[in-house]
């Protein structure tokens, strides 16, 4: 009986001991609550905008003066047998010779005595032969004295733009604000041509033809003519005879005339380049729906512009070829200003969308100058009132 009570007592003791050990064990692992999973999802804070920008061209103006003149190689006014070059021809020392036989039987050539004539000359236009039978040669120059300023709006240009906006949070209940920075590239292209006022100077040298009428222009002396001759044995051979028209080897007179007109000289101004815009500022966005929103932005803009300025001067004289001169200059400039834009944006997906908007930009102006010994031209490029449209795609990340 005692043994039974002992066994029963030990059973109760071990039962209580096991129960106490189970109570001291760690509680079972709880299943995580995923009801607030949205708090752990990454929300994109940045938006990249990539597209094109079509913007009005800068206002440009052109002005300046220049000189068109070939190097004067007409020689002295009265000297004989000189090398002379004109715009419409040339006169050189006489090249005629006589042939004599030396004591040893050899043929020797000697220059003919100076008889006031030359057989080496050329002319290019029939107008040089005067009605009273003389030959004239000319050198021309044009001093451009035009004071007009010609203004022109450069054509619109389309270029690429890239910008990134970083969401800074709520500004008001329905307004978000962000910081935006971007770059864009657009062209500069303007050209015009016009007649310009100029002072025209003509130097005319008159030469004696000794009653001869020269061949039709263009003509170059000495000249010869070939003919076919039949020999006594029936064969043929070619015979060459000199038919040069002789000219006086010194000018009879030199005359200089100067007139002013606005029809003989034509200028063409051309400006070609591009400008790179960097801009940064705050942006405010109004959310209409979950997909549709509008934003406005304004801030600083800096422009790096590079342009090539070319002026082509041309003068069509009465005789001879056109006289043309081209002068050019290249320059680069930095300019600081401001911008403003308004944009509508539609989100097609959570990450991508489309945008369209209007832009305004004012970044000052700069002058480009061509300065040479014979030209001084100025072009003004005004980048202070540019406006246009922008459109493209958005990417959130």
Residue ranges, per PLM feature:
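Cleavable N-terminal export/targeting peptides
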Residues: 1-43
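Extracellular/periplasm-exposed beta-strand and loop segments of Gram-negative cell-envelope proteins
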Residues: 63-66, 127-156, 188-274, 304-335, ...
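Outer-membrane beta-barrel domain signature, strongest for Gram-negative TonB-dependent receptors
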Residues: 33-64, 182
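Short loop/turn motifs that connect adjacent beta-strands in outer-membrane beta-barrel proteins
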Residues: 33-46, 165-179, 190-192, 287-294, ...
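Outer-membrane beta-barrel "beta-signal"
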Residues: 22-26, 383-397
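Surface-exposed strand-loop-strand hairpins of Gram-negative outer-membrane beta-barrel proteins
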Residues: 56-157, 194, 333
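Transmembrane beta-strands of outer-membrane beta-barrel pores
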Residues: 52-58, 183-189, 276, 300-308, ...
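Residues on the lipid-exposed face of transmembrane beta-strands in outer-membrane beta-barrel proteins
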Residues: 160-168, 181-183, 278-286, 298-302, ...
């Amino acid at each position: 009986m005692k043994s039974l009570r002992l066994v029963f007592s030990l059973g109760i003791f071990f039962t209580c001991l096991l129960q106490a050990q189970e109570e001291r064990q760690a509680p079972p692992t709880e299943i995580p609550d995923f009801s607030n999973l949205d708090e752990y999802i990454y929300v994109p804070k940045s938006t990249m905008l990539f597209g094109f920008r079509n913007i009005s061209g800068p206002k440009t103006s052109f002005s300046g003066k220049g000189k068109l003149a070939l190097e004067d190689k007409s020689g002295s006014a009265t000297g004989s047998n000189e090398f002379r070059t004109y715009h419409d021809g040339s006169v050189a020392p006489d090249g005629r010779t006589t042939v004599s036989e030396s004591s040893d039987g050899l043929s020797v050539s000697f220059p003919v005595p100076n008889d006031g004539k030359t057989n080496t000359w050329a002319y290019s236009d029939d107008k040089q032969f005067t009605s009273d039978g003389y030959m004239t040669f000319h050198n021309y120059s044009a001093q451009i004295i035009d004071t007009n300023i010609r203004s022109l709006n450069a054509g619109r240009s389309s270029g690429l733009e890239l910008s990134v906006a970083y969401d800074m949070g709520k500004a008001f209940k329905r307004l978000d604000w962000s910081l935006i920075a971007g770059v864009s590239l657009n062209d500069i292209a303007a050209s015009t041509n016009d007649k310009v006022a100029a002072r025209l100077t003509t130097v005319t040298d008159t030469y004696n033809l000794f009653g001869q009428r020269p061949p039709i222009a263009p003509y170059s002396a000495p000249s010869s003519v070939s003919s076919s001759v039949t020999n006594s044995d029936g064969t043929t051979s070619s015979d060459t005879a000199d038919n040069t028209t002789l000219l006086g080897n010194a000018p009879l007179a030199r005359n200089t005339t100067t007139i002013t007109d606005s029809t003989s000289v034509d200028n063409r101004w051309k400006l070609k380049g591009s400008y790179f815009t960097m801009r940064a500022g705050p942006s405010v966005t109004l959310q209409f729906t979950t997909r549709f929103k509008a934003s406005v932005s304004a801030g600083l803009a800096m422009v790096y512009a590079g342009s090539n300025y070319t002026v082509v001067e041309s003068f069509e004289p009465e005789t001879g070829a056109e006289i043309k001169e081209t002068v050019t200059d290249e320059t680069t400039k930095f300019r600081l200003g401001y911008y403003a834009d308004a944009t509508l944006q539609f989100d097609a997906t959570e990450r991508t969308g489309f945008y369209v908007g209007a832009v305004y930009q004012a970044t000052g102006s700069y002058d480009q100058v061509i300065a040479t010994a014979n030209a001084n031209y100025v072009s003004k490029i005004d980048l202070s009132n540019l406006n246009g449209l922008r459109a493209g795609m958005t990417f959130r990340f």
